[in-house]
Amino acid sequence: MNKQELSQMSGENQGGDYKFDVPMLTLEGEDGYFRLTQNKQETKLGDDEVKGVMLKFRCQYGAYLNEGERILFTSEEDSAQKVFDLIEITTGKGGKKFTTRIDRGTGKELKEKYPDLKFKQMVYFLLDDDQIVKLQIKGSSLSNLYRTKEQAEAESEDVGYFNQFGKDEYKFEYATILQANQYSKKIGNKTKTFYKIKFVKGEKLDDARMEFVGSQIKYVFDRLQAIAELKASRGQEEQPPVETYESEEPSPEDYEYQE
């Protein structure tokens, strides 16, 4: 048994176990490039597209208000029916920030009380180099996931990625290719160009790759399950500090142009 396993069993570093810390993969919406962000450090990916496998689906809500003087974001959960913690970040005099847990509720309950909240699909994603990252899908990119056949025909668009799979197919059985898809949107009196993520169904994985992907799905599931159990064991009055939640602090581009 190694020291990391012993440390987890002993509980001496439990405070750091509330967060599954992996790089965030996002599409820069104005310039159309993919980037990885971790601990406020950004790495621009040079490729026009990113290829990998979807491992685990989660969701989150957030809002960027008053030019950043007030930011709302929730914990990350498996579905909108789960109970989320809602976190508020406000900026006081001298730029000092105050972070507070202000509410709890399902996605629907929180949206009713805080209508500015926007939904984000989070996907733990295995890159071709075997690095696990967290893909953030928001705004117009969401329609490229969920668009129905009827909506696609009405909008002259592709059917949403999730609706391109047969009943006996699983998303983790196939490579997923992410591309920057250009579109125009009217902002005030001007029309601006933005980018959203286009999802392309790649090749079906061979048996060897599928075995590795299966092990990574289990790894992510076990890690998130351990975090959930640790939070539950603390009780509501002893919930972890807000700084340990599974999210980087939201930035303006996360919400500014969401529909």
What residues fall within each predicted segment?
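Generic serine detector
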Residues: 7-10, 75, 79, 140-143, ...
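OB-fold ssDNA-binding interfaces and closely related basic DNA-contact patches used
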Residues: 1-132, 187-190, 202-204, 255-259
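Polar/charged alpha-helical tracts
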Residues: 4-8, 85, 108, 112, ...
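Long, highly charged low-complexity segments enriched in Glu/Asp and Lys/Arg with interspersed Ser/Thr
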Residues: 65, 71-73, 188-251, 259
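Extended serine/threonine-enriched, polar tracts that run as long, contiguous segments within proteins
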Residues: 119-204
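Sequence-level detector for tyrosine residue identity
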Residues: 18, 33, 61-64, 114, ...
